[in-house]
Amino acid sequence: MYISRNLEQWNAFLQMLKIAFEENKAQEFLTLLLTADERDAVGLRLQIVSQLIDKNMPQREIQQNLNTSAATITRGSNMIKTMDPDFMQWMKQHLDLIEKN
C-alpha cells in the first residue's frame, strides 16, 4: 500500500477530515484545501476506480469514456492492485449503492 511521504501530515489530514465529517463540515473543509481542479481530479479518480472494479470494459474504453489519459487509468489500476481485497469489496459495495441512487 502507498505510504505518504510525510506520515505525520497525512495522519493530521485524516484526523481533521474525520472531525469535519463528524461535525458536518466536510464540504467546507475539502473546499478550503482543494482547488476546483483537484476536486475534479478526485471525482475522476473515483469514477476510474468504480469502472475498473466493475471490470465490464477495457481500460482503453474507460479512458475514452472519461476523456482522460492512459496514464491516469493505469495509476488507478496499479493502486487497486496494492489494496486489500476486502477493502476493494467494501469499495465496490458502496460504489454500487451510490450508483443506484
UniProtKB/Swiss-Prot annotation:
Residues 59-82 bind DNA. One of its GO terms (biological process) is negative regulation of DNA-templated transcription. Keywords: Cytoplasm, DNA-binding, Repressor, Transcription, Transcription regulation. It is found in: Cytoplasm. It holds the Pfam family Trp_repressor. It comes from the Bacteria. InterPro entries: Trp_repress, Trp_repress_bac, Trp_repressor/repl_initiator, TrpR-like_sf. The keyword Repeat does not apply. GO terms for cellular component: cytoplasm. One of its GO terms (molecular function) is DNA-binding transcription factor activity. This protein is an aporepressor. When complexed with L-tryptophan it binds the operator region of the trp operon and prevents the initiation of transcription. Belongs to the TrpR family. This is Trp operon repressor homolog.
